[in-house]
Amino acid sequence: MKSKLSKVVLLFMCLALLNSPLAVQAKEGSGDPQQQESLKPKEVKLQGDMRRAWIDHMIWDRGYMVSALAGLKDQDKVLARLLKNQEDIGNIIKPYFGEEAGNKLTALLKEHIQIGGKVIDAAKKKNEADLKKFNADWFRNADDIAKFLSSANPNWTEQELKDLLYKHLQLLTEMLQARLKKDWDADIAAFDKGEDHIIVLADVLTEGIIKQFPNQF
């Protein structure tokens, strides 16, 4: 009797696990067969490198923002690391678009960082005129990046890239405003959203490269 009862309990436990949220997510995640196709090793590497570089972009963006607003002694060191990250991103596209294109992207991204530093400084000093000016310049730089990338790859539309970059700036601004208000929950939430979004941007870039250069994968 005890043995039969144990078997019944075990059966119900198995059924419960099969219908648990994780099991449901696993089924949903399997999706359509095309999405289950294995990525080629070189595609996996590009995706990983691109995601890592852009996640680093968010991490060091935040690190610099924290340091600059608090006037910490590590500000210059953090800025140097953040600027190096833009070189890392430029280097990722060099095997596909060449040295000149990679350096051009790096230069545009470094400008993005430099303008962002001015935005942070103006916001910290509550200088509304400068904040408005530098914010407009920030979006102009985003337009330049979108235009450059879309001209290099027809799989990246200028409007799609603008939308992605504008969203990135919006989330950085949310993070900045939250830190200035000392609203730490909002700051963390903005960073989490920013990190999720930057992975989307990275994957769009990866997908475009794979489509344009299938023979390299």
Residue ranges and their predicted role:
Residues A26-Q34, S38:
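Cleaved targeting-peptide boundary
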Residues M58-D88, I93, A101-E111, G116:
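Early exported N-terminus immediately downstream of N-terminal targeting peptides
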Residues A16-Q25:
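C-terminal segment of classical bacterial N-terminal signal peptides
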Residues E99-F134, W138-R140:
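Mid-length scaffold segments of soluble, non-membrane domains
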Residues P33-Q35, K42-Q47, R51-A68, L82, ...:
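C-terminal amphipathic alpha-helix
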Residues M1-L10:
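Bacterial N-terminal signal peptides that target proteins for export
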